[in-house]
C-alpha cells in the first residue's frame, strides 16, 4: 500500500510541474514570433525583415588635409560579439527535473530573516549557473 501512495505522490508532483511549466510559457509568450501587427495593417504589406549595417567607425579626415604617408587612419575596434555573451552560451544539459553539473559553494551566514529568492531551480538560471542558496536567499551562482 505504501508504494502505491508513493506513486500517486510522484504522479501529482509531475502533473504540477507540467502545469507550472505551461503557465510560465504563457506568461513569457511564444518564442520567435516578434511583435503583433498594428491594427488595420495587413501582414502582407509589411516592410519585411530589418537589415542592420555595421558602419565603418574609423576617423574622418579633416577637410583639406591628406593622411600622413605610411600611416593608416585610426580604426575603431568593434566588439568580438554583437550579442549578449550569456544568451550566446549553448544550453546546458540538466533541465526541468535534473540538476546541472557542479556543486554549490558553502554558505557561512545570512543575517536576513526572510532572504529573497531569485530562482527556484537550475533551469531558471542561464548558461552554466546553478540555482544555489547564496549568501542571502537563493540565486544563480557559478558552481565549483
Curated annotation (Swiss-Prot):
<feature type="region of interest" description="8 X 6 AA approximate tandem repeats">
    <location>
        <position position="34"/>
    </location>
</feature>
<keyword id="KW-1015">Disulfide bond</keyword>
<protein>
    <recommendedName>
        <fullName>Protein WAP-3</fullName>
    </recommendedName>
</protein>
<feature type="repeat" description="2">
    <location>
        <begin position="40"/>
        <end position="45"/>
    </location>
</feature>
<feature type="repeat" description="6">
    <location>
        <begin position="70"/>
        <end position="75"/>
    </location>
</feature>
<feature type="repeat" description="8">
    <location>
        <begin position="82"/>
        <end position="87"/>
    </location>
</feature>
<feature type="region of interest" description="Disordered">
    <location>
        <begin position="64"/>
        <end position="85"/>
    </location>
</feature>
<feature type="signal peptide">
    <location>
        <begin position="1"/>
        <end position="21"/>
    </location>
</feature>
<dbReference type="InterPro" id="IPR019541">
    <property type="entry name" value="Trappin_transglut-bd_rpt"/>
</dbReference>
<feature type="region of interest" description="Disordered">
    <location>
        <begin position="28"/>
        <end position="49"/>
    </location>
</feature>
<feature type="repeat" description="1">
    <location>
        <begin position="34"/>
        <end position="39"/>
    </location>
</feature>
<dbReference type="GO" id="GO:0045087">
    <property type="term" value="P:innate immune response"/>
</dbReference>
<feature type="disulfide bond">
    <location>
        <begin position="119"/>
        <end position="131"/>
    </location>
</feature>
<feature type="repeat" description="4">
    <location>
        <begin position="58"/>
        <end position="63"/>
    </location>
</feature>
<dbReference type="GO" id="GO:0004867">
    <property type="term" value="F:serine-type endopeptidase inhibitor activity"/>
</dbReference>
<feature type="disulfide bond">
    <location>
        <begin position="110"/>
        <end position="136"/>
    </location>
</feature>
<dbReference type="Pfam" id="PF10511">
    <property type="entry name" value="Cementoin"/>
</dbReference>
<keyword id="KW-0677">Repeat</keyword>
<feature type="repeat" description="3">
    <location>
        <begin position="46"/>
        <end position="51"/>
    </location>
</feature>
<dbReference type="GO" id="GO:0019731">
    <property type="term" value="P:antibacterial humoral response"/>
</dbReference>
<dbReference type="InterPro" id="IPR008197">
    <property type="entry name" value="WAP_dom"/>
</dbReference>
<feature type="repeat" description="7">
    <location>
        <begin position="76"/>
        <end position="81"/>
    </location>
</feature>
<feature type="disulfide bond">
    <location>
        <begin position="104"/>
        <end position="132"/>
    </location>
</feature>
<feature type="domain" description="WAP">
    <location>
        <begin position="97"/>
        <end position="144"/>
    </location>
</feature>
<dbReference type="Pfam" id="PF00095">
    <property type="entry name" value="WAP"/>
</dbReference>
<dbReference type="GO" id="GO:0005615">
    <property type="term" value="C:extracellular space"/>
</dbReference>
<dbReference type="InterPro" id="IPR036645">
    <property type="entry name" value="Elafin-like_sf"/>
</dbReference>
<feature type="disulfide bond">
    <location>
        <begin position="125"/>
        <end position="140"/>
    </location>
</feature>
<feature type="repeat" description="5">
    <location>
        <begin position="64"/>
        <end position="69"/>
    </location>
</feature>
<keyword id="KW-0732">Signal</keyword>
